[in-house]
């Protein structure tokens, strides 16, 4: 469990969730699990705009969860997370789970340590591929650790793809 904490936070610039059955605008962050966000709207994670980011509260306690929900079930087999100033504010260890009901969760990506190269406006991404999950209504990303140089983490976009469709 480690993070580049030079600025006392980590950041994920954005998380875009999309596939053939659910547009990014249909991926809403579950409010009950994102109480630590500073951003006006966690929807910045799924708006398709890499120039804006959702940001955690300063001095956030880790681990913390980010939960996305869809109004209708979706299928996907890949997640991409995009961050800028990643060495200063990106997650450095994450895992992902899915659920059909928001109660029972299945791990699809175990805790994974992430390496970031840049501390500037370079938009970096991390890709997580796995066996296709179907009939999913909830995606939970657990941020175990992060670069917290600026006392928070930020995500520009979180994207979910169904490459098998």
Please describe what each predicted stretch is.
Residues 80-87, 144-146:
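Solvent-exposed strand-to-loop "edge" motifs in beta-rich extracellular domains
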Residues 1-6, 142-149:
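Short beta-strand-plus-loop segments that form exposed binding edges in beta-rich domains
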Residues 105-108:
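Tryptophan-centered short beta-strand motifs
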Residues 94-96:
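Short beta-strand elements bearing conserved aromatic residues within extracellular beta-rich modules
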Residues 5-76, 84-90, 110-122, 152, ...:
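Disordered, acidic Ser/Thr/Pro-rich linker "stalks" and the adjacent N-terminal cap
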Residues 78, 138-140:
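Short, conserved beta-strand segments of beta-strand-rich sandwich/propeller modules, principally
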Residues 123-138:
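Short, surface-exposed tryptophan/glycine-enriched loops
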């Amino acid at each position: 469990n480690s993070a580049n904490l030079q600025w006392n936070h980590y950041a994920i610039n954005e998380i875009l969730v999309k596939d053939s059955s659910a547009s990014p605008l249909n991926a809403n962050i579950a409010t009950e699990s994102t109480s630590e966000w500073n951003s006006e709207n966690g929807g910045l994670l799924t708006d398709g705009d890499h120039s804006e980011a959702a940001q955690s509260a300063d001095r956030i306690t880790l681990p913390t969860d980010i939960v996305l929900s869809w109004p209708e079930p979706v299928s996907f087999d890949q997640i991409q997370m995009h961050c800028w100033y990643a060495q200063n504010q990106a997650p450095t260890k994450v895992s992902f789970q899915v659920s059909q009901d928001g109660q029972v969760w299945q791990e699809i990506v175990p805790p994974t340590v992430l390496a970031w190269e840049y501390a500037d406006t370079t938009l970096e991404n991390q890709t997580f591929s796995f066996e296709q999950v179907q009939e999913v209504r909830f995606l939970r990303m657990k941020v175990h650790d992060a670069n917290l140089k600026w006392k928070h983490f930020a995500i520009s976009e979180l994207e979910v793809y169904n490459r098998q469709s």
